[in-house]
A protein has these predicted regions:
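A short acidic, helix-capping loop that chelates divalent metal ions and anchors anionic groups
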Residues: 113-116
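Terminal amphipathic alpha-helical/low-complexity segments used for targeting or macromolecular assembly
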Residues: 1-52, 56, 130
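Left-handed beta-helix
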Residues: 56, 61-62, 67, 75-76, ...
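Extended, positively charged loop/linker patches that create polyanion-binding surfaces
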Residues: 118-120
Length: 152
């Protein structure tokens, strides 16, 4: 039986201090989300400013949600579509020329439902080069998708 009052996020789990986390969430909710669709370089700049590794000519829409950008790598010419969620509790790597379409959910984190305190955990996700994840694809923690794969 779970006792959720004992839940806590392990020290260092987020990969950054609380101030940086809160600052990113404020920037994402304003400067990132309110930017016009065509301002891809602006959003790439914001992500790089928070530690993301972003390749050249990346297309990332303003409605994309990224939990911790310092755990994100996007290869050259990668696209991330409207309303996609990159839940970066663990590392997410998206290869060059890969497409993560609208409303996809890449989820690196979960909970151990068997632990008394519902312990949180994370595993990386790797999307290879020239992949296409079509609309509404869910990718679970620890999944690696090979180069050239189409899912949807």
């Amino acid at each position: 039986m779970q006792e959720l009052s004992g839940f806590s996020v392990p020290k260092g789990f987020r990969g950054a201090g609380g101030i940086k986390v809160q600052l990113w969430w404020a920037v994402q909710a304003t400067l990132f989300a309110w930017s016009p669709q065509i301002m891809y370089r602006w959003r790439a700049f914001l992500l790089r400013s928070f530690g993301a590794k972003i390749g050249k000519n990346v297309v990332i829409r303003p409605s994309v949600k990224i939990t911790y950008p310092w755990k994100l790598t996007l290869g050259d010419n990668a696209w991330v579509g409207d309303d996609a969620v990159l839940y970066t509790l663990g590392e997410i790597s998206i290869g060059a020329n890969a497409v993560v379409s609208q409303k996809c959910y890449l989820c690196t984190g979960s909970h151990d439902y068997m632990s008394q305190h519902f312990d949180i955990n994370a595993q990386p996700i790797t999307i290879g080069e020239k992949c296409w994840l079509a609309t509404d694809v869910f990718v679970a923690p620890g999944v690696s998708i090979g180069n050239g794969t189409v899912i949807g």
